[in-house]
Amino acid sequence: MLELKTHRLAIPIVLFAGLLWSFGPLVVRYMDNPNQVPWQYIFGRGLTIFILLNLYLYFEEGFNFYKNYKKVGKSGLLGGCGLGVAMISFIYSITNTTAAITLLCLAAMPFFTALLAFLFLKERISLNVWISIIVATIGIIIMALGNTEKSSIIGFIFGITSSIGFSVFSVTLRWRKETPKFTTVAIAGLFCFVVATFMILIKNQPFFATSFNSSMFSLHGTLVCLGLILYSIGSKAIPAAELTLLSLTEVIGGIFWVWLPLFGINEIPSTNTIVGGFFLFVSITYYSLIMRWNKRYIALN
């Protein structure tokens, strides 16, 4: 894999990865009635992610890439399932509430990760991180209080579930650091594909939606894969603190694209979402400053 050792080159690459991911909510909003074909979306997106990541691994490592599957172990399977649940929850969240709610729930992932690592890996949480978690929790509660409609509450719950699923993936990587990251994500794609296949058969539905929707499903999967590859290249040269801040590109961009009248969606966040989001951004910024002081580095290998 291409490795960047200079901070100056790594930052724009990670920013571009976040920019690619930020178009995900816009792609979903352009779909025709995605709430009526969630399993077809999960089927198409999961299959796209599985195929593209295996192709990338093949070109990166040659035919021996399949040996990565022998190395995943329990951590890889658990992480893949956690990530798969996150992907499934994402579509149910964003089709039942605003993109802002879904994305801000995902922005709380570092704090769920810290709590899970504390519970299962016995990682110590400092007082400053607890402060960040409390501030983030206040923001999440404020957003939850603004979701009074039944469908919006369901979307919020699925958004939190998606964030926890991503956190499970992150914690499993800490649990066993030699777990192949890309292979674990490919397993998540396969998990989505298998679960969606099962649900489609039970519901006696077609596997594919309209040609337009199917292309949107694959486009979203492609954006996820390309962003992941670029993120993995740039993340090796960037401290975790800066990565946390740079990851906000996805959140800010995702909210901005669905609001921008140019794209025809014009989805405006509610007051509670804006206030709760402000608390989340404050907590993430504070958390990033703490991480910077600790000089911690993370990366996808």
What does each model-found stretch correspond to?
Residues 34-85, 112, 165-169, 186-203, ...:
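Transmembrane alpha-helices of multi-pass small-molecule transport proteins
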Residues 3-4, 46, 145, 248-301:
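C-terminal-most transmembrane helix of multi-pass membrane proteins
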Residues 1-44, 81, 148-175, 216, ...:
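Glycine-/small-residue-enriched transmembrane alpha-helix faces in small-molecule transporters
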Residues 22, 26, 80, 84-88, ...:
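Hydrophobic/small/kink-forming positions within alpha-helical transmembrane segments
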